[in-house]
Amino acid sequence: MIMARKRHYLAKTGRDHGNPSGAAGERAPRGDAGRQVPRGDAGRRVPRGVTTGGDVTGDLSVDCDVVVVGSGAGGATMAAELAEAGVDVVVIEEGGYHPTESFTADSMRALRTLYRDGGGGMAVGRPSVLFAEGRCVGGSTVVNGGMSWRTPARVLERWSAEGVLAVGERDMEPYFERAESRHSVGLQDPETIGRDSELLKAGAQARGWAVVPNRRSQLHCAGTNNCSSGCPTGAKRSMLVTSVPRALALGARLYADCRVDRITRAGRAVTGVTGRFARGQALTVRAPTVVVAAGAIQTPALLARSGVRSGQLGRNLALHPNTTVVAFFDSEVTGWQGVHQAFQVREFMAEGLLLTAQNLPPPMLAGIVPAYGRELGELMADYNRIVTAGPLATDTGTGRVRNIPGLGTQVFYRLTDPDAARLVRGVELTGQALFAAGARRMLLPFDGAPAVRSPGELRNLLARPVPKASMQVYSIHLMGTARMSEDPRRGVTDSFGAVHGVRGLFVADASLFPGPIGINPMETVIALAMRNARRLLERRADGGLLPG
């Protein structure tokens, strides 16, 4: 059924990820959008308006109204919203342009081409935390699971109490609705749900726990479970197939394979950015407004390189620490068949714990489980009989992003004792659910821990202290390093992403979050970008993109 769904989708759509916005895309293109379609690296055709590193033969200099650094959830949304209002927008993306038809189940290739550092970023600490960032046109939305949830009301209330303006539920409602409409947010078609998700659901329900179907940005997902390698059908509504083509159709220009090195300034006002393509050619963009949406690691790094001075810049990193239990079943699970993460166990949200099942390709799984040599080989030999699941924790500790001479951008993170205890609790709960679903044994995410074969063994093992240094922790949700606050002493930007003390400079990604939100952050990023784009346009209509 899943493969039939995939074939039907491909036949119906032709894997076309052109402009999804209907009449809005009929507007005559401007600038580079009207030139002949070039061929990018590897000979692939790219849309009008996109310039890749393979197209560039010399240094380039361009002018625009707004330059956006980054093409992920925040950057692409901001670009599309501004372009729709008639603003001349240039988007710069460090990663490459990879169309839907180039995506396959080859996860090693995906790690090389779609992720920064091959998906092997590291926040140094005890334990160190492995993290992954997308680095391609569309950003991390190309390689995430497409989970789309509104910011929890309690989080918005906390932000409001901390003095962030216009982030109450009523304020954010129209932006959530717009984000969900633009990105086809809804429930998964039931025939595409895989057995790994069903097993976690069954085990949780057997224990009487609350389980909810996941809300995802998808349009009749085919259930190929290739989310982390790029959706091969275009059904996942990443920025690559939504806001990027929408912005291009409205006249925006996009330069891929180009790293922005610095934001240029004249006094307190920005004047644009400078950067280099992967093959060394320089790009200079002159613009009175710069929007930085490079993610919670690269955004503070770029701001710091560009002379932004704030006591909060690069601090307050939250990352929703995750860990994974590997459960072995007697019968085949074939977790790679079916949608990525179909359900969420929400029984323990008040404790700051969210439990999910997420099948991971072997190269990615190998990086986050404490199995080596023969044990790892045996695990992979049983790959078709395993369920990988685990907790996401709302962290209370924080980390920091720093530019260190000779070492580049470095990340540091402190897992607090309460957060470590929360993860251990999440591992025990996950194990209880999977044993209730019929698991025969489990590997736990702690170095040196033996396999457990019963709920009693699990309970007894975790009743003893688990050294933090032994924990295998990873993250895909990075946030908070350029947080919003009306008080420059407490935040890098104001409530709408305008950087304090610099005219024309904005932030539009999860760096803005004043703290962790305890849920997948993509829809929050999109909604805030839509909200902040509107405020930017209002300021522009008042005579300037940013008041002095």
Which sequence ranges carry the predicted segments?
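Extreme N-terminal leader/targeting segments of oxidoreductases
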Residues: 1-30, 34-35, 39-66, 84-85, ...
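Conserved redox-cofactor binding core of oxidoreductases
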Residues: 2-14, 20, 166-261, 270, ...
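N-terminal glycine-rich phosphate/pyrophosphate-binding loop and immediately adjacent elements
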Residues: 13, 47-159, 166-170, 309-331, ...
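FAD cofactor-binding and catalytic pocket of flavoenzymes
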Residues: 16, 144, 310-434, 441, ...
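Residue-level detector of alpha-helix initiation sites
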Residues: 72-73, 297, 512
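Glycine-rich loop(s) and the adjacent beta-strand/alpha-helix scaffold that form part
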Residues: 81-84, 88, 95-100, 105, ...
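FAD-site-proximal beta/loop scaffold in flavoenzymes
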Residues: 481-505
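A conserved FAD-binding loop/helix module that cradles the flavin
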Residues: 515-534
